[in-house]
A protein has these predicted regions:
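Cytosolic covalent-transfer regions centered on His/Cys nucleophiles
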Residues: 1-221
Length: 221
């Protein structure tokens, strides 16, 4: 039972003031409880919208910064070093040397050539990377690199995929989705290995748009 007042038929000024103060406190408490209840109901929706925003921001960064360059007379390591220094100048990374070292470390752990293709995926996460980045490099002559299966293989295209070391799970999901393009279907692989910049961009953007649509639909269910 809540608080109650015993009053005479004719309220004194003190009794009236006590009742008013009680009613004001009760009203304020009820408003606060309603506000907290609404906030708790809305929190899952808010978190879902934040996740969608992080997904879309990652996709925008990747597509905004995408480029495909034909490289002549450079080894894979040389083109990676050049690429990282350009990304440093454009503000994507803050220390090219750190990222170059991380790429070489990843390569030493296992081959990065994708078996059954002419593609190699060089990827790294580092504190020196400020935002996700996807760039590609077409070699003017095939080069031999270790494949992911441990066997040497010839490649004509290097895919460079970078992300911050503190990437959230939404960003990692998008980066993983980009990687999945390299093992998709023969038509997609042909575009990645031989298509021009606009053709490859269209493939990547369509793939990520489809992924985003599916993600958004799943969040609304």
């Amino acid at each position: 039972m809540g608080p109650y007042f015993t009053v005479s038929p004719m309220l004194t000024e003190e009794e009236a003031r006590a009742i008013r103060e009680f009613l004001e406190r009760k009203s304020a408490a009820e408003k606060r409880m309603r506000k907290e209840s609404t906030a708790q109901r809305n929190r899952p929706a808010l978190e879902a919208m934040k996740a969608v925003r992080r997904i879309s921001e990652t996709i925008v960064h990747l597509l905004d910064g995408f480029s495909l360059e034909v490289v002549k007379g450079r080894s894979v390591h040389e083109l990676l070093a050049d690429a990282c220094r350009r990304l440093e100048r454009s503000g994507v990374i803050v220390d090219a040397d750190v990222v170059i070292e991380e790429l070489r470390r990843r390569e030493s752990l296992g081959g990065l050539g994708v078996p059954g293709t002419t593609l190699a995926l060089y990827h790294a996460r580092s504190f020196a990377v400020l935002r996700p980045s996807l760039t590609m490099y077409r070699l003017d002559a095939p080069q031999t690199v270790p494949g992911m299966d441990g066997e040497p293989m010839e490649i004509n295209t290097v895919v460079l995929l970078l992300g911050p070391s503190d990437a959230d799970k939404e960003m990692l999901t998008v980066l993983s989705e980009v990687s999945s393009l390299l093992v998709k279907d023969e038509q997609s692989l042909a575009v990645l290995a031989h298509g021009g910049e606009e053709e490859v961009y269209s493939l990547v953007s369509a793939h990520l748009e489809q992924f985003f649509d599916h993600y958004w639909t799943s969040m609304k269910e």
